[in-house]
């Protein structure tokens, strides 16, 4: 049996084999080695000129990274209290595998600390919401843009933390994560086609099943801009869009459900024939959170 490094080298010499069945066998064997061989594949890519071989190497690197993403999401979902932000970072890593995540974590911590300094126990929930909105959208000048499936980066939490515009998903994730870290009762709820956070009253218990959670909601916040609005505004939204209000719309979404929703929306950005494989892969990834 060949030593590990020798076998990898031998497999590399066969990547350009014209027989697709041979390449499939070689590819699957290399995938068994996992992500540690990615630097070697990248080095091979840099020293390869043949177009088909380059595409094969790129595909293998992508599959190795996707395998890691699947494992990271499974590990995250299995945690007793999975962080919403850390779940969103997994999707950032899918799209930008070389991006360092610690600077994003540090930036969020700065925002959390500055928000905490402005809060006190005497503020009403609406005053708390105004503090968060001022910190995010005035002090840090986070910008909100309409949801567009032509701009996948807008869905990622990395965008608002890097002074780039974020859509309702990215900005709402930052807002919701802050509230969870600061123990503020603002939760993502299941309003159709919207990213809405509901501020629940202090006597509401998130893990208790109640017949009508709407009774505990004080007001709502729109994720793109942090703007608060009332139940009357919500009722008008349903009326305007011919949506029949249902109790399920007011139920809190778990962090796993939020991240699943994010992944499936992000997948819609990849509908072109050349990128459709990404949509299929993301839909499969989201199934981990079923």
Regions found by a protein language model. Give the residues of each.
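A structural boundary/capping signal
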Residues: 1-290
């Amino acid at each position: 049996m060949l030593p590990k490094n020798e076998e990898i080298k031998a497999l590399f010499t066969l990547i350009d084999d014209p027989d697709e069945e041979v390449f499939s066998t070689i590819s699957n064997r290399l995938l068994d080695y996992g992500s540690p061989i990615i630097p070697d594949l990248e080095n091979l890519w840099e020293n390869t000129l043949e177009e088909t071989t380059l595409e094969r190497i790129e595909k293998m690197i992508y599959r190795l990274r996707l395998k890691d993403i699947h494992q990271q999401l499974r590990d995250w979902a299995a945690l007793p209290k999975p962080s919403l932000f850390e779940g969103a970072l997994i999707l950032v890593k899918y799209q930008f595998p070389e991006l360092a995540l610690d600077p994003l974590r540090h930036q969020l911590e700065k925002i959390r600390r500055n928000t905490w300094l402005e809060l006190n126990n005497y503020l009403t929930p609406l005053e708390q919401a105004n503090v968060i909105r001022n910190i995010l959208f005035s002090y840090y000048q986070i910008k909100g843009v309409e949801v567009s499936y032509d701009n996948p980066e807008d869905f990622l939490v990395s965008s608002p933390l890097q002074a780039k515009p974020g859509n309702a998903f990215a900005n709402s994730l930052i807002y919701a994560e802050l509230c969870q870290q600061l123990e503020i009762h603002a939760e993502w709820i299941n309003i159709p086609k919207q990213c809405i956070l509901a501020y629940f009253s202090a006597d509401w218990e998130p893990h208790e099943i109640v017949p009508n959670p709407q009774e505990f909601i004080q007001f709502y916040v729109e994720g793109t801009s942090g703007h608060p609005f009332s139940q009357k505004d919500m009722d008008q939204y349903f009326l305007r869009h011919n949506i029949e209000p249902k109790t399920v719309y007011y139920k809190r979404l778990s962090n796993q459900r939020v991240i699943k929703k994010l992944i499936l929306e992000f997948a819609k950005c990849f509908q072109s024939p050349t990128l459709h494989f990404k949509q299929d892969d993301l839909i499969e990834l989201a199934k981990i959170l079923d």
